[in-house]
Structures are given as C-alpha cells and as structure tokens.
Amino acid sequence: MEEYETDIKQILGTVDRQTVSAKQVRQLLEERRKVDLSAHKKDLNALILKCFDETAAPSEKESLEKQAPARKTKGKRATENGTEEGKKPAKRTRKRKEDGEEGGKRKRNQDPANNPLNKPMKLSPKLAEFLGLEQLSRPQTVKKLWEYIKAHDLQDPNDKRTILCDDKLKSVFEVDTLHMFTMNKYLTNLMTKIPDDQLPKPQPKNEEPAAPNDLPKQEEKELVEPPTAESTA
C-alpha cells in the first residue's frame, strides 16, 4: 500500500479536508491509478488516515496528538534515529517529479463535469427538510452540513473531527455524535441516485464567434476572391 502514499497526499492537498471522507479519497485514488482497490479497503483507510495525520495543519496536528499520543511518541523516536529525516527529502523530490508527470491527469480528475461525486442526488424527506432542498450533490450536501455545524459551534473542542449533534441533526442522523470520516457513511442512506435521463441538462457554454470556415459559402468566397467585373456590373 505504501506505493499509494504520494498519490493520497496529493489528493488530500486538493480537497476540503474538513468534509472529505476516506471513501472519497479512495475513489479518487482509484480514478487516478485506474485500478479497483476495493479488496484493500481496510489497509487503504489506515493509510489515508496516516497521510491525513502527516499532512495536517498545526491546529489539526495539535488535536490529533491529543487523541493519539502513542503515534506521536513513535514518530518522535523515528526522527531521533534519523530515519524520518532521511526519508523526507526523497519524498519531496519524488512528489515534485510526479507532479510534473501527472499534472495533466490531475487536472482531468478535477474537472467537475466528469466527477461523479458532483451529480445531484435525491435527498431523503428528513434531510431535504433540514437543508430546504430536494436535490444536491454529495459535496454540496456535506458543505451545507458543515456550514450549519460551524455556525452552531457543534464541533467537540477536544477533537474538531467529532460533531456533537443538536436536536435538528439528531432528527436527521439519529445519533448523538458524528465523526467527519463517518458522516458520508450516514449520508449514503439519506441520498438516492437520480437516473441519468432525469438529471438536469448542463447549461451550454457561451458560443464563440464563427470562424471563416463556418461562414456561408458565398461569404467565404468573398473573403478569398476579389470581386470580378461581372459581379460588380
């Protein structure tokens, strides 16, 4: 699984870390590598959490260290032995190289029109009532939930990844607490796929001015041939 570590860290650098789930990261990794990794779900989830911890911002790291002192001690010991410090430059070099090789592929993966996660889904009656909408994509749904969570200060002060549900959230999820990595698991039962033929059609892009090859035959001829005496008589 270690061969996917660089890809996972790059993916975590392009998503909203407060709303993304391990499942979403795994799906994006499968799209990037063009492989089916469902058989390695457990190992991949552990690697995703490891990469999430290693790339956390200082405020995130402080919270993570409170929850996992054993992991912190292990990392410190590796640094003192020189192992961790010796590996870091190689990882940065490899990351820069792969950035150049896979830059085009990453851009394609980020195209919203080609991302299945951005398709609208039908919300359950309770979720629709809570959000005031009947259809939303999964990322939009998670974003609105986090807007509500932050507006009402529902994050556990000891671990910002844990949400302390108020009465409204309890009525939707039917639990007292949620974890940021399990929120999408609950949403799976509250959102239904919409058949492709029932999805709203994308808005057409602004049409560009017609090129000379697109002009009518007579106009095109006038562009390349000067008028003759007969045509001007």
Curated annotation (Swiss-Prot):
Gene Ontology MF, one: RNA polymerase I cis-regulatory region sequence-specific DNA binding
Signal peptide: none
Biological role: Component of the UAF (upstream activation factor) complex which interacts with the upstream element of the RNA polymerase I promoter and forms a stable preinitiation complex. UAF seems to stimulate basal transcription to a fully activated level.
Domain (DEK-C): residue spans on this chain: 1-53
Main location per the UniProt record: cytoplasm
CDD domains given in the database record: SWIB-MDM2_like
Gene Ontology annotations for the cellular component aspect, listed alphabetically: cytosol; nucleus; RNA polymerase I upstream activating factor complex
Protein name: Upstream activation factor subunit spp27
Key words of the record: Cytoplasm, Nucleus, Transcription, Transcription regulation
One Pfam short name: SWIB
Location of region: Disordered: 55-122, 194-233
GO biological process, one term: transcription initiation at RNA polymerase I promoter
Compositionally biased intervals (Basic and acidic residues): 194-208
Localization of this protein: Cytoplasm; Nucleus
Matching InterPro entries: DEK_C, SWIB_domain, SWIB_MDM2_dom_sf, SWIB_MDM2_domain
Record's subunit section: Component of the UAF (upstream activation factor) complex which consists of spp27/uaf30, rrn5, rrn10, and histones H3 and H4. Interacts with rrn10.
Domain SWIB/MDM2 intervals: 116-193
